[in-house]
Amino acid sequence: MNIIVVGLSHKTAAVEIREKVAFAPTQMEKPLQAVVALPDITEAVIVSTCNRVEIYATTRDVAGGMARIKRFLADYHNVPLELLEKHLYSYHGEDATRHVFRVASSLDSMVVGEPQILGQIKTSYGYAAEYKSSGIILNRFLHKAFSVAKRVRTETKIASSAVSVAFAAVELAKKIFGELSDKTVLLIGAGEMCELAAKHFINTGVRGVMVTNRTYERAEKLAEEFDAKPVHFEALMETLPKADIILSSTGAPHFIIHEKDMEEVLRRRKHKPMFFIDIAVPRDIDPKVNNVENCYLYTVDDLNGVVATNLEQRKVEAAKAEAIVEQEIGQFFKWLSSLEVTPTIVALRTHFDEIRKAELSKTISGWKDLPPGAEKKLDALTNAIMNKLLHQPTSVLKRIDQGNRNDLYVDALRNLFDLEVGGESQDNMMELED
């Protein structure tokens, strides 16, 4: 069984493309069930964040599985495959494992070392577990990824010099305005990113913070935590003129602020500049807002320059983290190999033993005047011959590396001897220790 990854990220696709294939976190059941319904796809997890959309799956048909998932992404989101495909990457085997371990450890993030991605993958895995699209392989795979991320955070200092996307957004605001003590901030959304942004804005000494969310109770809760002012979402347009800085991070599937809204907002502000930071994917703010005089709109893709701080120190720590990832890949594949190899060895020995016993029984039943103890000796002799014959193929199977060669050996044995490999036992499925 092969693990495959198909996806795109901030490295391969601009936000205009990423938002086209983003999945709403509250509506994961339908796409997860659709992926595992694809031919030869047995398990699936979907990860959808502001910086990446990835599907992790298991299949015996690597090329076919990747092609079907690419087609699924295009068809599900009504995006032409030829437009999407040039932004997609795909991995299998060790490359897939390395990629996911690196993503979970924040080595592939826009902000290397940021902690948010691990929580986002855990949430994605939670949906897959809830809707039963993940099984024994992806369950173990992602638990191992979480373990790798924990090792990276505890054994390196990669997180100590990292900045979050929210922090980068605040730093960008400081670069635009300089002094923020006379500025009022409006946060649209009440999730983790807005919570982090609230913390950073408060620390910079802004004049005030307002929070709005479709669920007013969540806005109230976040506002209370930071001594901010909660605002009903229905009052968004009336509230905008009071804000100098607007940071938006909701899960809305469409724009919540449009170009046509801004003329009246700016008139009421006497055309004082407004700074918009849209870190939502799909985007919350119509990009045409940037065409309005005195409106300055930035997206998550504009934060790259800010996150370059402390880059050299993070490179040193990232090298240590990469070594941990490589070490853990070997451990995981040792476990994954056992899922294929152990049941095949058991089936092979059972197959030979059944033949041995059948032939021995025929021989003994046609042998008159069998000396006392001969049956026992013949049984031992034939068993020893069988063990000698099976020793070499068994040893080879146990020591070869997991990968394409392993699949070839296992498949060849199963086909040559028409082996029926049943469900793996719990002993064979024992997880590696974290």
Curated annotation (Swiss-Prot):
Catalytic residue positions? 50 (nucleophile)
Give the transmembrane ranges. Answer: none
Catalytic function, reaction form: (S)-4-amino-5-oxopentanoate + tRNA(Glu) + NADP(+) = L-glutamyl-tRNA(Glu) + NADPH + H(+)
Q: Where does substrate bind?
A: 49-52, 109, 114-116, 120
Say which enzyme class the record assigns: oxidoreductase
Q: Which InterPro entries match?
A: 4pyrrol_synth_GluRdtase, 4pyrrol_synth_GluRdtase_dimer, 4pyrrol_synth_GluRdtase_N, GluRdtase_CS, GluRdtase_dimer_dom_sf, GluRdtase_N_sf, NAD(P)-bd_dom_sf, Shikm_DH/Glu-tRNA_Rdtase
Alphabetically sorted, this entry's keywords are: NADP, Oxidoreductase, Porphyrin biosynthesis
Q: What is its EC number?
A: 1.2.1.70
Entry keyword Ligase = no
Report residues binding NADP(+): 189-194
Q: Provide a Gene Ontology MF annotation, just one.
A: NADP binding
Example GO biological process: protoporphyrinogen IX biosynthetic process from glutamate
In this chain's numbering, which residues are marked as the site (Important for activity)?
Answer: 99
Domain comment (free text): Possesses an unusual extended V-shaped dimeric structure with each monomer consisting of three distinct domains arranged along a curved 'spinal' alpha-helix. The N-terminal catalytic domain specifically recognizes the glutamate moiety of the substrate. The second domain is the NADPH-binding domain, and the third C-terminal domain is responsible for dimerization.
Quaternary arrangement and interactors, per the entry?
Homodimer.
The record describes the protein's role as: Catalyzes the NADPH-dependent reduction of glutamyl-tRNA(Glu) to glutamate 1-semialdehyde (GSA).
Q: Which family does it belong to?
A: Belongs to the glutamyl-tRNA reductase family.
Additional record remark: During catalysis, the active site Cys acts as a nucleophile attacking the alpha-carbonyl group of tRNA-bound glutamate with the formation of a thioester intermediate between enzyme and glutamate, and the concomitant release of tRNA(Glu). The thioester intermediate is finally reduced by direct hydride transfer from NADPH, to form the product GSA.
Protein name in UniProt: Glutamyl-tRNA reductase
Lineage start: Bacteria, Pseudomonadati, Thermodesulfobacteriota, Desulfuromonadia, Geobacterales
Gene name, per UniProt, is hemA
